[in-house]
């Protein structure tokens, strides 16, 4: 049971949502697939805020097994306390227990025939005529696994893509530093609404409060600052904007991590290899959210790899259809969010307040172009930021 076989059609590195969905679709479509996870337990350590849009389109029913809260919208809070309420769209979804959700996705993949190796670290790749030799330390024993295809789903710190000569996001301006408490005894504005706070309290980022059943995820993501992310977060806990709603809060878990918010990497495929999820920059540069996007790109990756196996064509030319397909669905969204993030990072507190005072307090949808016109009409000095959006 512990030993790895000598060869597989597809080796997926990383058992997060991107990796598990990749292996699921590869196995489902007939490829002999190995899913490798460095942690001894899939889903740990948790490094994200755990909010996701609806998942029914993936053929997954929202289950109380992993869903902790249903989300119907969000409050966007300006430095002066002005609240903008947004409902529907991508704010409609869930907060999940990632420890359980990630394991659920891996189990779903295993039921399609995927072999899973936990507490396993890829220590190197060697290109061969047939594909790759993957060097794996599995439960303390060294293995060399032959494979025709590798899917790099090993996260923001991806080493697999770099072993293969594809750049992953590691520039400090492209990775958001995140810290989060899971807390109990928190009073929310609404138990089914997320809260986001912006401004100098969180340089070039935002602070979030996400309902999670009996607890709340209270976190921060910043690009730069004079202090560590955790120091900004600790300062926020007593911020007057909260009106004492966290004064009795008690942390039950602490999480840290990095989020690749610089947009997708330049190229996500080459001969015998595909990059997906955080490793590929499949993350909204604006919000830092990427679970749903990673899942969808993972499905595409798995399907393309299975087709590659059945056609016995593992070339860069054949695998390019993976990038073509995910870009058709998601590239415009990612690049727009990168543009919006760049604008947001230039705004000071007074300018953020001016924006909040220029738009309706209740938004059923977010049309950035229309909002930009409203903002500039009321605050013409902001035209320098929004002229390319109008």
UniProtKB/Swiss-Prot annotation:
Binds 1 FAD per subunit. This is Digeranylgeranylglycerophospholipid reductase. GO terms for molecular function: flavin adenine dinucleotide binding; geranylgeranyl reductase activity; oxidoreductase activity, acting on the CH-CH group of donors, NAD or NADP as acceptor. Transmembrane segments: none annotated. One of its GO terms (biological process) is membrane lipid biosynthetic process. The keyword Transferase does not apply. Its EC number is 1.3.-.-. Reduction reaction proceeds via syn addition of hydrogen for double bonds. A 2,3-bis-O-(geranylgeranyl)-sn-glycerol 1-phospholipid binds at residue 368. Keywords: FAD, Flavoprotein, Lipid biosynthesis, Lipid metabolism, Oxidoreductase, Phospholipid biosynthesis, Phospholipid metabolism. Pathway: Membrane lipid metabolism; glycerophospholipid metabolism. Its cofactor is FAD. It holds the Pfam family GGR_cat. It catalyses: a 2,3-bis-O-phytanyl-sn-glycerol 1-phospholipid + 8 A = a 2,3-bis-O-(geranylgeranyl)-sn-glycerol 1-phospholipid + 8 AH2; 2,3-bis-O-(phytanyl)-sn-glycerol 1-phosphate + 8 A = 2,3-bis-O-(geranylgeranyl)-sn-glycerol 1-phosphate + 8 AH2; CDP-2,3-bis-O-(geranylgeranyl)-sn-glycerol + 8 AH2 = CDP-2,3-bis-O-(phytanyl)-sn-glycerol + 8 A; archaetidylserine + 8 AH2 = 2,3-bis-O-phytanyl-sn-glycero-3-phospho-L-serine + 8 A. GO terms for cellular component: membrane. Is involved in the reduction of 2,3-digeranylgeranylglycerophospholipids (unsaturated archaeols) into 2,3-diphytanylglycerophospholipids (saturated archaeols) in the biosynthesis of archaeal membrane lipids. Catalyzes the formation of archaetidic acid (2,3-di-O-phytanyl-sn-glyceryl phosphate) from 2,3-di-O-geranylgeranylglyceryl phosphate (DGGGP) via the hydrogenation of each double bond of the isoprenoid chains. FAD binds at residues 18, 37, 48-49, 51, 98, 122, 278, 290-291. Belongs to the geranylgeranyl reductase family. DGGGPL reductase subfamily.
């Amino acid at each position: 049971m512990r030993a790895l076989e000598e060869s597989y059609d597809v080796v997926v590195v990383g058992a997060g949502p991107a990796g598990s969905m990749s292996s699921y679709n590869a196995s489902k479509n007939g490829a002999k697939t190995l899913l490798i996870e460095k942690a001894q337990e899939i889903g740990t350590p948790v490094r994200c805020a755990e909010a996701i849009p609806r998942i029914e389109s993936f053929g997954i029913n929202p289950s109380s097994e992993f869903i902790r809260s249903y989300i119907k919208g969000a409050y966007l809070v300006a430095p002066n306390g002005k609240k903008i309420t947004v409902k529907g769209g991508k704010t409609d979804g869930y907060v999940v227990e990632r420890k359980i959700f990630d394991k659920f996705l891996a189990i779903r993949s295993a039921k399609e025939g995927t072999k899973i190796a936990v507490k396993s670290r890829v220590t190197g790749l060697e290109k061969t005529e047939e594909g790759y030799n993957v060097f794996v330390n599995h439960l303390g024993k060294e293995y060399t696994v032959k494979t025709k295809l590798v899917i790099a789903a090993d996260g923001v710190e991806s080493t697999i893509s770099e072993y293969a000569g594809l750049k992953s996001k590691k520039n400090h301006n492209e990775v958001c530093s995140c810290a989060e408490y899971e807390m109990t005894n928190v009073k929310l504005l609404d138990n089914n609404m997320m809260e986001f706070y912006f401004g100098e309290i969180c340089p070039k980022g935002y602070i979030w409060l996400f309902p999670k059943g009996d607890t709340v995820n209270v976190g921060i993501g910043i690009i730069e600052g004079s202090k560590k992310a955790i120091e900004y977060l600790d300062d926020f806990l007593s911020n007057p904007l909260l009106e004492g709603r966290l004064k009795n809060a008690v942390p039950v878990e602490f999480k840290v991590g990095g989020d690749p918010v610089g947009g997708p990497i330049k190229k996500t495929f080459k001969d015998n290899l595909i990059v997906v999820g955080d490793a590929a920059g499949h993350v909204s540069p604006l919000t830092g959210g990427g679970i749903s996007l990673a899942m969808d790109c993972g499905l595409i990756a798995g399907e393309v790899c299975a087709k590659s196996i059945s056609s016995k064509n593992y070339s860069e030319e054949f695998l390019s259809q993976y990038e073509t397909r995910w870009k058709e669905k998601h590239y415009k969204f990612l690049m727009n969010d990168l543009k919006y993030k760049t604008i947001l990072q230039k705004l000071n507190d007074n300018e953020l307040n001016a924006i909040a005072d220029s738009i309706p307090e209740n938004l059923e949808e977010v049309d950035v172009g229309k909002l930009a016109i409203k903002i500039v009409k009321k605050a013409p000095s902001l035209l320098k930021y929004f002229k390319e959006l109008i």
